[in-house]
Amino acid sequence: NGLDQAGIAFVGTSETQEVDLQSLGDAAVGLETGYFYSAAHESAANDAFKAKLKELYPNAEPNPATVSAFDGTHALYQMIGATGGKKDPDAAIAAIKGASWESPRGPISIDAGTRDIVQNVYIRKVEKDADGRLFNREYKTYETQPDYGVQK
């Protein structure tokens, strides 16, 4: 598209998620984005998540939606466990306020005041591996980022 030759840097968020990355082709090489999840995130939790996803759904690609569903389900299990399966909204909310765990996306927590997620944001750059496949290489982490759209 010529933007890079004109000195215009592309800044984005999830535009280079792995589910779309190969279809972008070589024009994507060098693009830098910041987001809370990339399938290329290196961690034991992400490796286990990707392996289980592949086992259950061989054609599925790990992406922000699948990891968000995974974490939402984890939160629900915590809430159900705290209530013993009984209808107790106060106990359910109390169980998750301030909770933290190791997600496939990295460490996350639920802000006790806003009940919104606090998570890392990874700055990554699209590169090509030895087989010519595009991937996001994380090179900087902004840890424990709140939802800046929420007012306390």
Task: Give the location of each predicted region.
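Extracytosolic ligand-binding ectodomains
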Residues: 1-152
